[in-house]
Design a protein with these regions (language model features):
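Membrane-interface starts of transmembrane alpha-helices
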Residues: 33, 37-41, 74-89, 145-154
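Membrane-water interface of transmembrane alpha-helices
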Residues: 93-103
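A structural feature that tracks compact, well-ordered secondary-structure segments
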Residues: 98, 128, 137-140, 153-171
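Juxtamembrane helix-capping/reentrant segments at transmembrane boundaries
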Residues: 105-124
């Protein structure tokens, strides 16, 4: 479903979608229904937003940490304050782009932005804080997997779960 908007994001997305289409339908000769295609492209968009979210979160964290360390506002808790600020602002970033490009409102659908934003924060808090902490404990303490590998394994569970929570709960349209 190509868009006819001329903004840079739409142009980049059309290129990505053409590459996906070529690989899946031409090279692998997969038969994909329109509904499957829409869900797949939505998941890829969600992944792109998530990748940008990770970069934004890290940059905000580092900047906040440097500001706190330079001004010695909260010396022993500086990294926690920086993490909270990074979480709040990066989820807001994700909300904006997910609302604009990934989980767009259907025709004649209604969606409360405030409720959607609160649900977005809750889903990211659940997967990003609660679930990842439990899974990390399981991988590291119970299964003795490296602390460096555990977060990567977490992504295999938390990203699809977060996608489902956002698609069917946070960004669900009222008809």
């Amino acid at each position: 479903m190509k868009r006819k908007n001329n903004d840079i994001g739409t142009k980049i997305w059309n290129i990505i979608e053409n590459i996906m289409d070529y690989i899946l339908r031409k090279i692998f000769r997969l038969k994909i229904s329109d509904k499957q295609w829409n869900t797949l492209t939505q998941f890829v968009k969600f992944g792109i937003v998530g990748l940008s979210n990770t970069i934004i979160s890290y940059l905000i964290y580092v900047i906040a940490l440097l500001i706190f360390q330079k001004n010695v506002w909260i010396p022993s808790w500086d990294y926690l304050a920086a993490q909270i600020i990074a979480f709040v602002l990066s989820v807001l970033w994700s909300f904006y782009w997910n609302n604009k490009y990934v989980f767009q409102k259907g025709k004649n659908a209604q969606r409360s932005l405030v409720k959607t934003l609160l649900k977005t924060y809750m889903s990211y808090a659940f997967t990003g804080l609660f679930l990842n902490s439990i899974l990390s404990f399981l991988w590291v303490e119970v299964l003795h997997i490296s602390k460096l590998v555990a977060p990567i394994i977490n992504l295999l569970i938390s990203v699809p779960l977060n996608f489902v929570m956002n698609k069917f709960w946070a960004f669900r349209d009222k008809k």
